[in-house]
């Protein structure tokens, strides 16, 4: 079984801090093309799943172009399961603009959510589980104590963000 893991792609980033408008536009296109190439490569290689561990986008205001390209890529590859954990830069940005989610797009929430990768069962009937949670200021202090995994499965845990520690 083959799985692709990625994070911090930051599609639709303004890139205005260090680049000219022309270079920023060029880089923005390159990022979207690279994401397309990754998905195409996955399909060609028989990848079962693509795990996106946060910050697929860089803004809450995703362009229609980027949203449609990503949605069409996901829908156009129904044999690949996409597991999308939103990060601190893309909360709700992609999914809020969709009238309905592609069937092969699996999302995580503020509580632990697990999905079993189909076709990965071992002799005991257990397979690969992809488990994740979107960290928030409200859950980040206690969520780790609530993780429960099946020891008979191969478990992949997906998180994004670092914990902010405050002194004083």
Segments (PLM) and residue ranges:
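N-terminal active-site segment of His-dependent metallophosphoesterases
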Residues: 1-69
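His/Asp/Glu-rich metal-coordinating catalytic cores
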Residues: 49, 58-166
